[in-house]
């Protein structure tokens, strides 16, 4: 098969994979699943992971304050740093009220994202961000509980990148899912939305 045809097939495969990922994101963004009446979707749940300081933390450590949750990885070239920058802007806008909320960065790349790697990465963002990692099994479990999907994608030049759900989750003070948190608005509007849940 000619190299040009191989490249075309690879591009089509990547496009198809992207459609699957987008479909999953759209399904989550449509809102909670319901059977027989309104209810809060079963998104989120217990976890036991390691933070950027090497300390074991659980979902209970984040109770009592609403939080934003996002899945990503430190080698992410665009979506992750952009999202974390926008989340950082929201916390800066909150001023003294920033201590009444939290944000969690769940890695989808525990192979490379050790606590020191995450700590260095998050040093560029707001200190209210907690970066969490763990064993591949632990990460798979928490991703499943949030209905987040991710997969390793080999790169032609060697190494790999990660495809992953790019939703920001708004969770309430009890760790229950509220809604996907849109960043496609001004940081002031996003701040006002988070402030409603403090």
Spans of model-derived segments:
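Short, small/polar residue-rich loop motifs at catalytic or cofactor-binding pockets
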Residues: 42-44, 66, 163-165
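Hydrophobic beta-strand anchors of alpha/beta hydrolase catalytic cores
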Residues: 68-69, 103, 168
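Structural microenvironment flanking redox-active thiols in thiol-disulfide oxidoreductases
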Residues: 82-142
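Thiol/disulfide oxidoreductase modules built on the thioredoxin-like
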Residues: 138-193
């Amino acid at each position: 098969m000619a190299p040009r045809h191989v490249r075309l097939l690879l591009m089509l495969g990547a496009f198809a994979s992207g459609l699957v990922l987008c479909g999953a994101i759209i399904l989550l963004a449509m809102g909670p699943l319901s059977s027989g009446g309104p209810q809060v979707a079963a998104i989120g749940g217990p976890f036991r992971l390691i933070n950027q300081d090497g300390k074991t933390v659980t979902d209970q450590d984040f109770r009592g304050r609403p939080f934003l949750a996002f899945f990503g990885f430190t080698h992410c070239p665009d979506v992750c740093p952009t999202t974390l920058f926008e989340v950082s802007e929201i916390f800066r806008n909150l001023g003294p009220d920033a201590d009444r909320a939290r944000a969690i960065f769940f890695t989808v790349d525990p192979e490379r994202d050790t606590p020191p790697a995450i700590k260095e990465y998050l040093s560029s963002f707001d200190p209210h961000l907690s970066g969490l990692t763990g064993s591949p099994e632990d990460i798979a479990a928490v991703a499943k509980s949030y209905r987040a999907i991710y997969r390793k994608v080999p790169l032609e030049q060697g190494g790999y990148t990660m495809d992953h759900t790019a939703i920001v989750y708004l969770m309430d003070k009890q760790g229950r899912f509220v809604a996907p948190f849109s960043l496609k608005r001004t940081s002031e509007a996003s701040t006002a939305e988070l402030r409603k849940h403090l």
